[in-house]
Amino acid sequence: MRQHRIVLLPGDGIGPEITAVAKLLLDALGHQHGFKLNFEQHPIGGVAIDASGSPLPASTLEACQASDAVLLAAIGSPRFDALPREQRPETGLLSLRAGLKLFANLRPVTILPALIDASSLKANVIKGVDLMVVRELTGGIYFGQPKGRIEADGDERAFNTMTYSRTEVDRIAKVAFELARDRSGKLCSVDKANVLDVSQLWRDRVDALAANYGDVELSHMYVDNAAMQLVRNPRQFDVLLTGNLFGDILSDEAAMLTGSIGMLPSASLGSEGPGLFEPVHGSAPDIAGQDLANPMAMVLCAAMMLRIGLKENDAARALEGSVERVLAAGFRTGDLMSEGCTQLGCAEMGEQLLQAL
């Protein structure tokens, strides 16, 4: 029997509730599809600060590094807002990404038929949308040097540096090309090569790598046009590749095509070692412990983990199918409620998903 070592990081807020749902379904899928998941649970974020004083204990990082995949629920609590930034729960996530050497962030955006009316865009615009934003996570203007604020000539000036190396562009582009090859074979690289030198290097390297992927149709688009096209005609896209700053903005824009942040998973990958799979939503401390959380994003993270991290494609498809069937049957958590639907709590939604498997 195939065995996989999984680290669960429930974290803060609603994290434990949605983690319990994901684990329930993953255990069932293992029995159905002939594999066993060996789970370890470790603290991160606010709960880790409470227990050990650190948002990422060394034991948590070591367990993650030794795993096959990491499933993280949520990090953050207003209780820690008064702490210096480097001591807050969120720094645990940044340290985890660094410790796992993750550089590629994947954000899928899929419009499910049962939720098409949840979007603020017209149904005829978003029907059939199924795209993936691939964002470079560790370079670009967020990390470039020099940066800072200075006083000079009686004025104050602030500056940041947008920089990418050939190596950084090549490794993220390879991730996007491979994803496009496994999907519809279409890749759109987003840059600002008409203005920025760094984008000209980006485009040159993506073009150079395209020679190795003759089965992938490559196009380029300036970021301002891409932002417009995501709203005007999102169906034209399959895989979108872009840098850290542009990807930060475009992935949030694309996410809102769905109409609910409670349905959005993500993955962060490195060249080797385990991937990190986490919902886009936060820890929602205002509803924590009340059985009100929507577990769907966490469940879809589990599906991404099965497909990308563990290569258990049949189980991933089964889990995604259960989500579609439960929504089609009219079951909703409070954040997705609409007329004629049946409202469920987090645990009840988990039971419905289990039955739908």
Curated annotation (Swiss-Prot):
Residues flagged as site, Important for catalysis:
142, 192
Ligand binding (Mg(2+)): 224, 248, 252
Q: Name one GO cellular component term.
A: cytosol
Per UniProt, NAD(+) binds at 282-294
What is one process in the GO biological process aspect for this record?
L-leucine biosynthetic process
Q: What does this protein do?
A: Catalyzes the oxidation of 3-carboxy-2-hydroxy-4-methylpentanoate (3-isopropylmalate) to 3-carboxy-4-methyl-2-oxopentanoate. The product decarboxylates to 4-methyl-2 oxopentanoate.
Q: Report what the protein is called.
A: 3-isopropylmalate dehydrogenase
UniProt source species: Prochlorococcus marinus (strain MIT 9313)
Protein's gene = leuB
